[in-house]
UniProtKB/Swiss-Prot annotation:
Protein name: Nuclear hormone receptor family member nhr-16
Domain NR LBD: residue ranges: 115-387
The UniProt record lists the keyword Zinc: yes
Gene Ontology MF terms in the entry: DNA-binding transcription factor activity; RNA polymerase II cis-regulatory region sequence-specific DNA binding; zinc ion binding
InterPro entries: HNF4-like_DBD (IPR049636), NHR-like_dom_sf (IPR035500), Nucl_hrmn_rcpt_lig-bd (IPR000536), Znf_hrmn_rcpt (IPR001628), Znf_NHR/GATA (IPR013088)
Amino acid sequence: MGGPRFKDKVFLKCAICQESAEGFHFGAEACRACAAFFRRTVSNRKTYSCQGNNDCDVTINIRCMCRACRYIKCIEVGMNPAGVQQRLPPSKTLVEVSMDLPTVSNPSILSFPSPPSSLMLHIPSSYSNQMPILDKMRKSYETLCNARKTLHRKDGANIFQDNVPKPVTYKKAIDQGMKDVKLTSDWVSWCFEDFKNLSIDQKKILFHNAYTPYFMMEGGFLSHIRNTPEHLVMPSGDYIDTLDLNSFYNCSESDRQISSKEIDRLFKPSNDRFIKSVTLPMMSLQLDIFEFFVLFTLLLWDTGLIEISEECIEIGTKVKTQVLKELDFYMRNVKKVEEPLVRTANIVNLLPAVQKGVRRIQDDLEVTKVFDLYTASDEFYNLMSGRF
């Protein structure tokens, strides 16, 4: 009995680099080198950037393996950062963070209490005074999360009891997305006094352009926070299970059924691409909530839109400049990032990936509609195209 088991183990391959595996480490079969790399990355809060397109070859025969892609591969195959025992911080923490699951952040800065019902991040007032917009966004986001608990509460559910996340169908995803439009627009007005003072038509242009990418980007960010990249998290806390798209599209309320083969051909590549280009890089960067707010600010105040006025362009430029200055202060004084410019560039580089991912999904839906391959509701098309 012992002999065959030993023999089988010899031939197991590391899920990351294809070297001979040493055993099951942090949720995946891995060699000693990849397990040590993952442990060092998580425990030391290391961040990496890829010089390519986040798709480098990380097999053992590569001489200078891309560390960013190696870490992404670790996450892809199931390695869980929460499984790495964290070092105790050397001094009293400056920032208290509580979230659904612990993320990988600087241990000398952040502490992780028991998970509460929503994501909250607090910094001392001496720092928040230097980050007025970002701190206001954090406070209003907490209000948004609490409002969502009420809005998306199931009939008869206790508002004080945490929702147990479960997979949703596309009909429920539409319902949650459309319900969240008004809440999100209110959140934007709470965050930015300048937005509140814009004319109605300028508000509509900015918000309609930003909502769908934001909806997808937030889902990817919350997936990163939960360490479940295969789950695109919805506003309610429920999620789209990208490993079971058949149940997502072929729900009992569907207007028309579609085969698993067609789902894999039409929709799976777009979902996989979004995870690989957005969610996994967020996990690799260990993106935090303030950095997410910066991404949303840049997404909302898109001064390249041809429909917006010169005044709106001027206001948007001013807001983005201020927020980037606050991010620089945050990185230098709170997170203690050694190279804040490099990290900022890597974070901002996520925006094109978000936009491309959303456009790819929109294109797929348009193809299914034009060629009558799948009949989704008008609400679904409108939500994904920003027409609401």
